[in-house]
Amino acid sequence: MVSERSSKEKKRSRARSEDSSSSDYEEKVKRHRGTEKDDERRSRRSDKKDKKSHKHHKSSTSKKSKDDKPKKKHTESDHKLKEGIPELSMEDYFSKNNEFATWLKEEKRTYFNDLTTEAARGLFSRFVKRWNRGKLESRYYEGISTAPRTAHDWMIKRR
């Protein structure tokens, strides 16, 4: 009897597990079964992938030589400074500050102290470009001892 019960129970438990596994499978299929919109999206994606994969590169027979490179608009001779005048870089921000402050006041009509750090650095990069191209007046290259910093008049007595 014990053996009969155990075999019957085994059959029942198998039937239950088969039922539950089949229902699990159906739920998964239902979850993954998309709408027509999903199918359209998938087909569009695959079309895009196909288009991307069919791009062609130029053949190796049409290699360009060094002579085919486009000419630069400006040569290095366009930017040559006079003898003895060094080129500036952004590292010269503090050493050429008097010249920069004078240029700001005269060219941009603004004072150095009125600018934020970022704005001053941006304008200094413009100043450096003009300096390196030799577009500034000669007095900038000769050196400026003092420069206007603010619009404030300090009213200090001079003797």
UniProtKB/Swiss-Prot annotation:
Principal location: nucleus
Stretches with biased composition (Basic residues): 51-63
GO biological processes: auxin-activated signaling pathway; cell division; cellular response to auxin stimulus; gynoecium development; negative regulation of cell division; regulation of auxin mediated signaling pathway; stigma development; style development
A single cellular component GO annotation: nucleus
UniProt-listed InterPro entries: SCI-1-like
Basic and acidic residues biased stretches: 15-50, 64-85
Organism superkingdom: Eukaryota
Positions of region (Disordered): 1-86
Effects seen without this gene: Increased cell number in upper pistils leading to enhanced stigmatic structure. Impaired siliques formation. Reduced expression of auxin-related genes.
Subcellular location(s) of the protein: Nucleus
Record's keyword terms, sorted: Auxin signaling pathway, Cell cycle, Cell division, Developmental protein, Nucleus
Protein's UniProt keywords contain Cell cycle: yes
Entry annotated with the keyword Iron: no
Role according to the record: Component of the auxin signaling transduction pathway that regulates cell proliferation and differentiation during flowers stigmas and styles development. Involved in the regulation of auxin-related genes.
Protein name: Style cell-cycle inhibitor 1
Organism: Arabidopsis thaliana (Mouse-ear cress)
Lineage: Eukaryota, Viridiplantae, Streptophyta, Embryophyta, Tracheophyta
